[in-house]
Amino acid sequence: MSDIALTVSVLALVAVVGLWIGNIKIRGVGLGIGGVLFGGIFIGHFAEQLGITLSAEMLHFIQEFGLILFVYTIGIQVGPGFFASLRVSGLRLNLFALGIVVMGGVVTAILHKLFEIPLPVVLGIFSGAVTNTPALGAGQQILRDLGIAPDVVDQMGMSYAMAYPFGICGILLTMWLVRVLFRINVDDEAKKHESAITNGHALIKTINIRVENPNLSNMAIQDVPILNSISIICSRLKRGDMLMVPSPGTVIQIGDLLHLVGQPGDLHSAQLVIGQEVETSLSTRGTDMRVERVVVTNEQVLGKKIRDLQVKERYDVVISRLNRAGVELVASPDASLQFGDILNLVGRPSSIDAVADMVGNAQQKLQQVQMLPVFIGIGLGVLLGSIPLYVPGFPVALKLGLAGGPLIMALILGRIGCIGKLYWFMPPSANLALRELGIVLFLSVVGLKSGGDFIDTLAHGEGISWIGYGFFITAVPLLTIGILARIFTNMNYLTLCGMLAGSMTDPPALAFANNLHATSGAAALSYATVYPLVMFLRIITPQLLAVLFWGMG
């Protein structure tokens, strides 16, 4: 059998064994994708014993390409929400997550100096303790840039494997300790979160208002400031028994019923100006109008503003809402369309069909992957990661590397959405498939490289000590920030658990947090809020630690 065929066969075996290990759950918690690492260690140990030699060049390529696929698809997935998560609504969560990352780096530095842990080993322990695989890849790359021998760099993968399972356990233990320490009732926390969501967040609502203000009589909608704003859409007007789609030039009269779409605060302001809310239905049932949702798939309209489509002037149709990545938004005239946006249309059937044809509404396109933008994005990401950043006093230039470059580029491209006919939307199923493939390839190679000496290190070497160091790196920041967040901000427990899981970018921990209350989405929401920033910081941190430790000797 050729070297290539042998290497591919062994990698396939590692993936099968590793994914099987990851599916084994104890009390609902398993290693998940991390099981592939231990599958690689298991197969790597026996390959060493049997004298099986694999292609080193091929393994290196597969490891790096797998990492690129993984971080790029993560960036494309979270890109649309990344910059929004940095705004005020998520600022507090991101600050606490930042504190966890920084404190983890400080604990790592202290352990490195106190116990004189070798640089590759301590970076591997750090990456495993925070259960972040891209951090492992970034750390290995900077060590190679520093000129450290490949066999020494591979120690990082072995120490990562030692610390990884106890990193997961440390997160779960922290969640349990915070719950016990503050005597938290999970059901009460879920109710509090639901109440906060209902009362505090600006959700899209609708209201029917009768025009009673005499000052508005015979005024065009575009001349009424509250109605001619980007925060409210008037999608229907009923006059007597006639239901119509109003245009900016439509003249309103006393007694008209208006169907408004917007955020609760804006709708309340409109009610104060226009008149009283009424229970009268403005449903399209029994009329020649209908409401329909269509999806934007036509490359010709990507990047265009809603006002530029002129759907009211050309088709007598109103776009009342815009759904982007699961978030309902007011269809502001200045909003630019992105691939996959869902538009809520109100109008006559024939007119809606015409608008649907204009924007595409080809559901099958949502399941297709445009591969050209994928490789353009990966190529640009690799170039970005290769740009050296020279810092005075540092022995080598810092780089975003093959982990950071594609991630940052994907975040930017995911936020932009499209450039001309190129769109970076990726169907969730395709994104997940590429992401899982990438991480399986990466972890398989890391496990294979670590497997030869893993058992000896655990049984006769310093493996137990490495596990202890890793537990400190995991537990100290999580417990400290978890307790401070609960005491000083009274953070909701489910939100706190999601933030802790997100600060470690740990899906098994998120699964555990979600299972604390099956119907609450609090944990998932906070996890998603901190995940993009933390993933970036986790990739940069081992590089900074490596250069600092190297410089200090």
Swiss-Prot record:
Domain RCK C-terminal: 191-276, 279-361
Membrane topology field: Multi-pass membrane protein
Residues spanning the membrane: 4-24, 28-48, 65-85, 95-115, 158-178, 371-391, 403-425, 439-459, 464-484, 493-513, 533-553
Positions of disulphide bridges: none
Swiss-Prot/TrEMBL keywords: Cell membrane, Membrane, Repeat, Transmembrane, Transmembrane helix, Transport
The keyword Repeat belongs to this UniProt entry's keyword annotation: yes
GO cellular component, one term: plasma membrane
GO biological process: potassium ion transport
Molecular functions (GO terms): monoatomic cation transmembrane transporter activity
Source domain of life: Bacteria
Pfam families linked: Asp-Al_Ex, TrkA_C
Keyword Cell membrane part of the UniProt annotation: yes
Record's subcellular location: Cell membrane
Main location: membrane
Entry-linked PANTHER family: K(+)_H(+) ANTIPORTER SUBUNIT KHTT (PTHR30445), TRANSPORT PROTEIN YIDE-RELATED (PTHR30445:SF3)
Family: Belongs to the AAE transporter (TC 2.A.81) family. YidE subfamily.
Cross-referenced NCBIfam families: PRK03818.1, YidE_YbjL_dupl
Name of the protein in question: Putative transport protein Ent638_0015
Upper taxonomic lineage: Bacteria, Pseudomonadati, Pseudomonadota, Gammaproteobacteria, Enterobacterales
